[in-house]
Amino acid sequence: MAFWGAPLDCEDHAERAMLTAKDMVALIDDLNAELDAEGLPNLNVGVGINSGPCVVGNMGSQSRFDYSVLGDAVNTASRLEGQTRNYEEWILMGESTVQYKPEWTKYVDSIQVKGKSELLSVYTLTNVAD
């Protein structure tokens, strides 16, 4: 999991997340070309991106804690990542992220995800400027 906006504000968090996802997919594509040349199976990656308020900080006990992030936006991103296997897209995003860079995205579907009573509009990444 990766996140932006904590501990310091990050106004371009959505753009950074989209560019990072694009770079991840490009690196996996390069690695898969090498694996193909070796006759080895390819790797797949699924990326779910969502934006929203979260609780961020050190969580756990004094003897063992992690700096982590919790909240509905995180859970939704996880659900989106899980849905990538149902589409021919390695990256799926919620509207809360898409609103920041709609020109970089295309609509994929409206889906039901666990923990949500209403349908979630899902988008993927296209036309990204570096």
Please place each PLM-identified region on the residue numbering:
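Cytosolic regulatory/linker segments at or just downstream of nucleotide-handling modules
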Residues: 54-56, 77, 83-130
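Extended hydrophobic-aromatic, low-complexity segments
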Residues: 11-13, 57-59, 68
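Alpha-helical scaffold within the catalytic cores of cyclic-nucleotide enzymes
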Residues: 6-47, 51, 72-85, 95
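Active-site loop/short helix in cyclic nucleotide turnover domains
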Residues: 3-8, 53-61
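Charged/polar, solvent-exposed surface patches and flexible loops
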Residues: 2, 33, 99-100
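Residues embedded in well-ordered beta-strands
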Residues: 1, 46-48, 90, 123
